[in-house]
Amino acid sequence: EFDKDYHNNVKNILESNTILNSIVSNVSDSNKEIMELLSAKTKLIKIDSLLKIPFKNNYKTKSTLGQDRLVLVSSAAKQFPNNNVLIIDLGSCITYDFISVENEYIGGAISPGLNMRYKALNSFTANLPLLNPKKIDDRIGENTEDSIHSGVVNGIIFEINGTVDYYKSEFKEIRIILTGGDSKFLSKKIKNSIFANSNFLLLGLNYLIELNKK
């Protein structure tokens, strides 16, 4: 039912508006019918390892690079040229992606996201409850629920701060970008100077359309 409604909504948008270009990545959870519809009505640009991108990709396994990561690095390359940039995306997973001042994408890291950590504690243990994310002030949990919140939330904060400190020690004058669905939840807890932008990925998608529409 959801797929049918989704298809109809896309169809209505295309019929009600003049749309010349469209772009598809794994961020949009596309299916075959949607792809066919977009191909018939627009110039469809598919994000893959063959796409024209605004940076040099030095990733050793280009075909396995996540499409959302490629889009985020494209956004950084266009918005902050001639800069060292670390993009931290707080989504289902937490991804770290680094692009150098020479406009070369080096790579980064992937770790479990906020909700994934809560679910893992519940799924892989016998007695720990499944909790919703909660902001906490104390690092020491005085009961089981607070201990889970402390472990998950503070664990991510320590991870991000430690990762940022490492990159700052290796690269001078680095810009730190925080984005993704959980960025607002965690941004105030992170000590390092960070530019937060929840639309960073959307800007990257738009840049790729402009670069590949000709």
Region locations from a protein language model:
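Nucleotide/phosphate-binding catalytic cleft detector across ATP-hydrolyzing
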Residues: 1-85, 104-214
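Short beta-strand scaffold segments in enzyme catalytic cores
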Residues: 94-99
